[in-house]
């Protein structure tokens, strides 16, 4: 039983794979880099690695020291999972089991569930024997250890091999029944550190206890001693991101439905024009080369005829009223004119035909790079160049739908989301507040297509795509990566060094390249598109049009949105009839440290949407009715969150792959390669020279520097002369 267990390294990737080999689902291990910062998210337990002190190096004996913090009550000790370590080199598995088997809401799998049920009520010593007699645990443990050398160095008689090297030990910090316990398999009793404060989490107290322990061991030195290492057992972030993505995609569909419903109420004539437009699609699909230049100008005439009389094409969009959207569908199509053409003259060449993508990809530019947008702007593709009118002041309570309808999506590449006028030439303006309305009859068609794509996106299993396609029109996960901020090579960095959710010193390449982080240019580009570039105008528009984002943004990824028949959009308040527990139950489980409040809320709202029975028990909170501009701002917020979680999920998947690569490098046996390489050197006649060179270098390096500068004193001892044979 006590033979064959190998020593494991303190690596979060190794522990994560070990958890999977145990059969546990939904759990991973992260490394803690900073004890001063608060832990984000739920934590099941801490695994602390420290250097084993001299008088306790014998790993085969359990320490019998007892102090005031030791729990000697057999009922308390036997009801928790606390096992004595009776096997050398098994402290890593003991520490991991001490965390997992003391959590009530973790899917342990068949192996650990059987272990927990079998050892229920056992003494710590009996539980230690149970671990030693579990071949599944030993096999999983040794599968992630480095191979032992074939020939061990000769041992001195009476000296243990453990004493010849530095020994490190793992212990666990776990919250049980509202109190923080330290579970050390080499101690006879668990250590009770007491309860934590009402206004703090159990992790805060655990960090204080660990910092005090490190401070005592290092005699007050800074708390970054390399002899210590701390890891946290946390929920699997892949499940969290997948659940968030599901909720966000459902909410995206709800926002699109609300936007479509609002347009149907405010612009009922668009439904009729949409039907007539579909009947005239064959006429519009004719090649543009068959039309004369006069025919191209005729397509623009109805738009300009209803505007205020102007002298040139540069003032067309300056004062168009809302009635421009009521023009017949056959004449409302705008065509991009070459820069050299004029309104009254015939262009020298026909207008170029712009290759159009599908409707949802053509204008759904939330994830489009701003550099690409500027290139299109410089090339004259998709935007017209007309002077800007100064923005007009308006009151806070007026509902100017002429200004708010500007951001509705359109299939025409010549009309995109226009930013508000800031006094600079080159941007479009409206008669209401300096913007061109893009609410055209084919807006309903675009929203219908997006609703269909959103429904398809919900029905398809979640997968990570590195390029935008028909299945995910709005999500473009970046494939490029930036190097780590520290001078390191990604091929040599372990996956645990690349990034961690707990204040990692190295940043993930995918997160560094994520375009939807708060400081990214895409987020600022979206805000510029919505609210303009002027700071004062930005503040005013944030108050006016960012109301939906301010109200629903905090819960957009954790709760479902409810759309009423009257267009009121509100979050759902889940009752206790759902699968999740009530707040009181949640708080009691939170005292055990393994509740996972954030993840449970997400699971609750997801199941309430998937299951009709749970959906009926959900009650919508008081909501409000938002304008089209506010709904579009909320839609862009949802799209940014989706892109963000797609990138985070892709990062977790890539990190898990690197965990496996590091594990293969760690457990691979290089003896055969080394033997083959040495034999090849011997065949080439190079081995003898290399051995002589290395031996001579070692001899020169082995001379003490102090002896080189030491003055030699004359030897005054009398030396005997060599014996010479007398001649006979």
UniProtKB/Swiss-Prot annotation:
**Where, per the database record, does this protein carry Phosphoserine?**
292, 369, 395, 520, 536, 584
Instruction: Please list the residue ranges annotated as the ULD domain.
Output: 669-697
Where's the motif Nuclear localization signal? 716-721
Show the GO MF annotations. chromatin binding; chromatin DNA binding; cysteine-type deubiquitinase activity; histone H2A deubiquitinase activity
Instruction: Set out the biological process GO terms recorded for this chain's protein.
Output: cell population proliferation; common myeloid progenitor cell proliferation; erythrocyte differentiation; erythrocyte maturation; gene expression; granulocyte differentiation; hematopoietic stem cell homeostasis; in utero embryonic development
Q: Where is this region: Disordered?
A: 273-333, 372-436, 463-523, 574-623, 702-728
Tell me the keywords, alphabetical order.
Answer: Chromatin regulator, Chromosome, Coiled coil, Cytoplasm, Developmental protein, Differentiation, Hydrolase, Nucleus, Phosphoprotein, Protease, Thiol protease, Ubl conjugation, Ubl conjugation pathway
PROSITE patterns xref list: UCH_DOMAIN, ULD
Give the subcellular location: Cytoplasm; Nucleus; Chromosome
Give me the ranges of the annotated region Interaction with nucleosomal DNA forming a DNA clamp with ASXL1.
Answer: 698-700
Q: How is it modified after translation?
A: Ubiquitinated: monoubiquitinated at multiple sites within its nuclear localization signal (NLS) BY UBE2O, leading to cytoplasmic retention. Able to mediate autodeubiquitination via intramolecular interactions to counteract cytoplasmic retention. Monoubiquitinated on at least 4 sites near or within its PY-NLS.
Q: Which reaction does it catalyse?
A: Thiol-dependent hydrolysis of ester, thioester, amide, peptide and isopeptide bonds formed by the C-terminal Gly of ubiquitin (a 76-residue protein attached to proteins as an intracellular targeting signal)
Sequence segments annotated as region (Interaction with YY1): 641-685
| Phenotype when changing residue 91 to A | Abolishes ability to suppress tumorigenicity when expressed in NCI-H226 cells
Q: What else is known?
A: Has the ability to ability to suppress tumorigenicity when expressed in NCI-H226 cells.
Query: What does the entry's free-text domain comment contain?
Result: Possesses 2 overlapping nuclear localization sequences (NLS), a classic bipartite NLS and a non-classical PY-NLS. The classical NLS probably mediates import via the importin alpha/beta system while the PY-NLS mediates nuclear import via the transportin system.
Q: How does it assemble?
A: Core component of the polycomb repressive deubiquitinase (PR-DUB) complex, at least composed of BAP1, one of ASXL1, ASXL2 or (probably) ASXL3, and one of MBD5 or MBD6. The PR-DUB core associates with a number of accessory proteins, including FOXK1, FOXK2, KDM1B, HCFC1, YY1 and OGT; KDM1B specifically associates with ASXL2 PR-DUB complexes. The BAP1 deubiquitinase activity is not required for PR-DUB assembly.
Functionally, this protein is described as follows:
Deubiquitinating enzyme that plays a key role in chromatin by mediating deubiquitination of histone H2A and HCFC1. Catalytic component of the polycomb repressive deubiquitinase (PR-DUB) complex, a complex that specifically mediates deubiquitination of histone H2A monoubiquitinated at 'Lys-120' (H2AK119ub1). Does not deubiquitinate monoubiquitinated histone H2B. The PR-DUB complex is an epigenetic regulator of gene expression and acts as a transcriptional coactivator, affecting genes involved in development, cell communication, signaling, cell proliferation and cell viability.
Tell me the protein's name: Ubiquitin carboxyl-terminal hydrolase BAP1
């Amino acid at each position: 039983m006590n033979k064959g267990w190998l020593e494991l390294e303190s690596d979060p990737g190794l522990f994560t794979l070990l958890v999977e080999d145990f059969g546990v689902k939904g759990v991973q291990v992260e490394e803690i880099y900073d004890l001063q910062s608060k832990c984000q998210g739920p934590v099941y337990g801490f695994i602390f690695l420290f250097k084993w002190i001299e008088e306790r190096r014998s790993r085969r004996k359990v320490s019998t020291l007892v102090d005031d913090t030791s729990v000697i009550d057999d009922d308390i000790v036997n009801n928790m999972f606390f096992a004595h370590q009776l096997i050398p080199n098994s402290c890593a598995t003991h520490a991991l089991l001490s965390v997992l088997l003391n959590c009530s809401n973790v899917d342990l799998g068949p192996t650990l569930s059987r272990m927990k049920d079998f050892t229920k009520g056992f003494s710590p010593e009996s539980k230690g024997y149970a671990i030693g007699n579990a071949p599944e645990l030993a096999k999983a443990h040794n599968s992630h250890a480095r191979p032992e050398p074939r020939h061990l160095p000769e041992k001195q008689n009476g000296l243990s091999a453990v004493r010849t090297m530095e020994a490190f030990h793992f212990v666990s910090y776990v919250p049980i029944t509202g109190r923080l316990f330290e579970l050390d398999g080499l101690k006879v009793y668990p250590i009770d550190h007491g309860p934590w404060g009402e206004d703090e989490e159990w992790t805060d107290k655990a960090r204080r206890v660990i910092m005090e322990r490190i401070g005592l061991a290092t005699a007050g030195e800074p708390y970054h001693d390399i002899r210590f290492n701390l890891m946290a057992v946390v929920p699997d972030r892949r499940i969290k991101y997948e659940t968030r993505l599901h909720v966000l995609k459902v909410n995206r569909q709800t926002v699109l439905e609300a936007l479509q419903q609002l347009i149907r109420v405010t612009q009922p004539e668009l439904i009729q024009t949409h039907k007539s437009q579909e009947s005239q699609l064959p006429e519009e699909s004719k090649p543009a080369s068959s039309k004369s230049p006069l025919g191209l100008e005729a397509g623009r005439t109805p738009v300009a005829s209803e505007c205020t009389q102007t002298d040139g094409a540069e003032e067309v969009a300056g004062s168009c009223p809302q009635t421009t959207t009521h023009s017949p569908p056959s004449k409302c199509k705008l065509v991009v004119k070459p820069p050299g053409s004029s309104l009254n003259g015939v262009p020298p060449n026909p207008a170029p035909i712009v290759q159009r993508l599908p409707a949802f990809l053509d204008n759904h530019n939330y994830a489009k790079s701003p550099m690409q947008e500027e290139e299109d702007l410089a090339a004259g593709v998709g935007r017209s160049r007309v002077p800007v009118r100064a923005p007009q002041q308006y009151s806070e309570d007026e509902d100017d739908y002429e200004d708010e309808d500007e951001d509705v999506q359109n299939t025409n590449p010549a009309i995109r989301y226009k930013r508000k006028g800031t006094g600079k030439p080159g941007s479009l303006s409206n008669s209401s507040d300096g913007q061109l309305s893009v609410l055209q009859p084919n807006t309903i068609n675009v929203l219908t297509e997006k609703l269909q794509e959103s429904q398809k996106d919900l029905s398809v299993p979640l997968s990570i795509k590195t390029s935008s396609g028909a299945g995910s029109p709005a999500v473009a996960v970046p494939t490029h990566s930036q190097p780590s901020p520290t001078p390191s090579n990604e091929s040599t960095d372990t996956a645990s060094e690349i990034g961690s959710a707990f204040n990692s010193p190295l940043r993930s390449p995918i997160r560094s390249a994520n375009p939807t982080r708060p400081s990214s240019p895409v987020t600022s580009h979206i805000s510029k598109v919505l609210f303009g570039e002027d700071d004062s105008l930005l503040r005013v528009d944030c108050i006016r049009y960012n109301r939906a984002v301010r109200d629903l943004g905090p819960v957009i990824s954790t709760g479902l949105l409810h759309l009423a028949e009257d267009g009121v959009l509100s979050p759902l308040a889940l009752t206790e009839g759902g699968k999740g527990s009530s707040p009181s139950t949640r708080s009691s489980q939170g005292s055990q440290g393994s509740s996972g409040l954030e993840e449970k809320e997400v699971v609750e709202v997801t199941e309430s949407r998937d299951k009709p029975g749970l959906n009926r028990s959900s009650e919508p909170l008081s909501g409000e009715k938002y304008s089209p501009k506010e709904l579009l701002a909320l839609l862009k917020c949802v799209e940014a969150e989706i892109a963000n979680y797609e990138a985070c999920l892709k990062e977790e998947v890539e990190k898990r792959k690197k965990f496996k690569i590091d594990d293969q490098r760690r457990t691979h046996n290089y003896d055969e390669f080394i033997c083959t390489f040495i034999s090849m050197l011997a065949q080439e006649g190079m081995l003898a020279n290399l051995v002589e060179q290395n031996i001579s270098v070692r001899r020169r390096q082995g001379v003490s520097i102090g002896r080189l500068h030491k003055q030699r004193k004359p030897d005054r001892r009398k030396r005997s002369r060599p014996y010479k044979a007398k001649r006979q």
